[in-house]
């Protein structure tokens, strides 16, 4: 928990204080009063009856003593339950393929009033210019969009080619920005544990802020050392005992339920009345189709209540107050005097049915957000421009030679998990002994002219066709999987032609593709249009076989070397447990 930075975010002038106190005392007129409402008590459990009184951006008072208080406007909640605005503790907005402006339009009406985002996807492609754009978007957003300064660009030095660096000097230039809450996920955990000075310099520079972690499956002395370095949280836990041990050692636990990594069922049993202040909810990576059809943090709260019997006040606590306290955002997370008036009115608290949202004391209208979207996006000056410095490819670029009787390494996918297993398969004249093995390749897209790095993939479920994408964590090179070199080349050439994007090929033809013109990561289409296009892509992909629920998001993590066990980067096959490159052929 980091309270040392609260002064940075809770800006309120003396004049605002005097106006707020006057309304609290009953000596002045409120801007809004919400009547006919019950407030969920996140501290004690139960409910508080009575109005919510708002002056400016802040709550002036709560309770029956304000029943007859005067207001410029009154909001009839019709018996709704009021809870604090939801907070996502860790996400990459780019992974939604929406701009920050469009993301706000899609998620704010669902009660997501605050996000803590790490824009390291666009920073890996465009460097500091990408971070600066996110900051501009955050400055003009109604949603509270806070930024963690990306710490590992690239994710792991010397393991991949990416588009830009983000030096400590550049990072420090953003440290005191009003939207910055700390240092984003420190993914090079072996480097931290071994005491690499370059990494410790980053931790020292941001130690007065919040230091985000990333340590999937870590335990023992290594976990102790990582926490001893000052790391405060982790969103990568996927096993119950792993999460429990991290909590025991004082680390805060971000329980993640994204579109590919789905850890809520495994970790939800940990949440209780005692440790809930140390537990938070996050999505990390969630696509627009799921946001439109299932929700965002609201979907996670709903599952905690309905599937895991988490008490109401505890479920909403981990979705708001716990995260606010952890990041030192003490003006957020509670419906109490002096707190920012980020309020979600629920017609059904158990089903998380959002009736109305207020942020910074103002009611939110979804149609107004949509109407403002184009102008706000233009005002933010998005970093347009082709970031694909790659010539078209041919089938021969993906040719691999195999020797009968030899054994070859296979990246083995676990559906709906980011980790993979490292298996092997023997090749014969009839092919591999495993019939689920297909091909995977990663092509750098930043003008280095490297030959494609090629490998084998099992368990993905691809029976025919090919999928290609420029969303490929964290360097965002071109990743392609396929059953034939010809279709792989066709898919890759389509995303090159689009200036970045996603593509499905089957029967020798492009079945569906989605251009992503901003950094090869984001679309400028509306959330609804983007969700429809994702739906078409998924439908086309399902014709290729029994793929993961979110095939493109799952595929995007097959090149991320900081998550075990076997991955493929633009420079070759990488052992994510030994943190070293390895060979396709098994020789030992």
Swiss-Prot record:
Which BP terms does GO give this entry? adenine catabolic process
Asked if the Swiss-Prot or TrEMBL record annotates the protein with the keyword Glycoprotein, the reply is no
Listed InterPro entries: Adenine_deam, Adenine_deam_C, Amidohydro-rel, Metal-dep_hydrolase_composite, Metal_Hydrolase
Top class in the EC scheme = hydrolase
**Catalysed conversion reaction:** adenine + H2O + H(+) = hypoxanthine + NH4(+)
Q: Which cofactor does it need?
A: Mn(2+)
Q: Fetch the Gene3D superfamilies from UniProt.
A: Metal-dependent hydrolases, Urease, subunit C, domain 1
- EC number(s): the record gives 3.5.4.2
Keyword list (alphabetical) reads:
Hydrolase, Manganese
What CDD domains does the record point to?
AdeC
Q: Name one GO molecular function term.
A: adenine deaminase activity
Any transmembrane segments, and where? none
Which protein family is it in? Belongs to the metallo-dependent hydrolases superfamily. Adenine deaminase family.
Q: Which proteins does it associate with, and in what oligomeric form?
A: Homodimer.
Could you tell me what this protein is called? Adenine deaminase
Q: Which organism is it from?
A: Escherichia coli O157:H7
Q: What is the lineage of its organism?
A: Bacteria, Pseudomonadati, Pseudomonadota, Gammaproteobacteria, Enterobacterales
């Amino acid at each position: 928990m980091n309270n040392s930075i609260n002064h940075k975010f809770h800006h309120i002038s003396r004049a605002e204080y005097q106006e707020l106190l006057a309304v609290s005392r009953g000596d002045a007129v409120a801007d809004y009063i919400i009547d006919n409402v019950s407030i969920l008590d996140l501290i004690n459990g139960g409910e508080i009856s009575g109005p919510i009184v708002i002056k400016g951006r802040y709550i002036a008072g709560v309770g029956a003593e304000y029943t007859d208080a005067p207001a410029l406007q009154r909001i009839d909640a019709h018996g709704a339950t009021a809870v604090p605005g939801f907070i996502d503790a860790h996400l990459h907005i780019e992974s939604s393929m929406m701009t920050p402006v469009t993301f706000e339009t899609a998620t704010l009406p669902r009660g997501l009033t605050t996000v803590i985002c790490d824009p390291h996807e666009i920073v890996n492609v465009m460097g500091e210019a990408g971070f600066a754009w996110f900051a501009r978007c955050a400055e003009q957003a109604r949603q509270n969009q806070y930024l963690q300064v990306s710490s590992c660009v690239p994710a792991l030095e010397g393991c991949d080619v990416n588009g830009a660096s983000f030096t400590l000097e550049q990072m420090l230039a953003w440290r005191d920005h009003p939207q910055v809450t700390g240092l984003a996920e420190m993914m090079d955990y072996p480097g931290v544990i071994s005491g690499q000075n370059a990494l410790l310099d980053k931790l020292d520079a941001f130690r007065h802020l919040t230091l985000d972690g990333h340590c999937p499956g870590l335990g023992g002395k290594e976990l102790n050392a990582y926490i001893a370095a000052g790391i405060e949280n982790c969103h990568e836990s996927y096993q119950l005992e792993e999460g429990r041990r991290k909590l025991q050692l004082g680390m805060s636990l971000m329980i993640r339920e994204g579109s590919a990594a789905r850890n809520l069922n495994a970790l939800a049993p940990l949440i209780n009345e005692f440790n809930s202040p140390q537990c938070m909810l996050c999505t990390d990576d969630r696509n627009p189709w799921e946001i439109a059809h299932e929700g965002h943090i609201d979907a996670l709260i709903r599952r905690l209540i309905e599937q895991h019997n988490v008490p109401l006040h505890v479920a909403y606590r981990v979705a708001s107050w716990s995260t606010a306290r952890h990041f030192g955002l003490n003006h957020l997370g509670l419906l109490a005097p002096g707190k920012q008036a980020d309020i979600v009115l629920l017609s059904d608290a158990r089903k998380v049915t959002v009736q109305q949202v207020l942020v910074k004391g103002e009611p939110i209208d979804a149609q107004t957000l949509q109407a403002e979207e184009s102008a706000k996006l233009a005002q933010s000056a998005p970093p347009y421009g082709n970031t694909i410095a790659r010539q078209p490819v041919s089938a021969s670029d993906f040719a691999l030679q195999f020797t009968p009787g030899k054994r070859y390494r296979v990246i083995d996918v676990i559906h709906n998990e980011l980790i993979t297993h490292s298996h092997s398969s023997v090749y014969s004249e009839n092919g591999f002994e495993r019939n689920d093995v297909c091909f995977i390749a990663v092509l750098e897209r930043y003008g280095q002219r490297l030959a494609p790095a090629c490998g084998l993939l099992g368990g993905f479920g691809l029976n025919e066709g090919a999928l290609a994408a420029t969303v490929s964590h964290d360097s965002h090179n071109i990743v392609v999987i396929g059953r034939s070199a010809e279709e792989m080349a066709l898919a890759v050439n389509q995303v090159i032609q689009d200036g970045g994007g996603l593509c499905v090929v089957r029967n020798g033809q492009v079945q569906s593709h989605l251009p992503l013109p901003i950094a090869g990561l984001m679309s400028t289409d509306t959330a609804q249009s983007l969700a429809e296009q994702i739906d078409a892509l998924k439908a086309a992909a399902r014709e290729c076989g029994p793929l993961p629920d979110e095939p493109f998001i799952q595929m995007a993590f097959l090149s991320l070397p900081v998550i075990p066990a076997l991955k493929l980067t633009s420079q070759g096959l990488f052992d994510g447990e030994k943190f070293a490159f390895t060979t396709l052929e098994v020789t030992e």
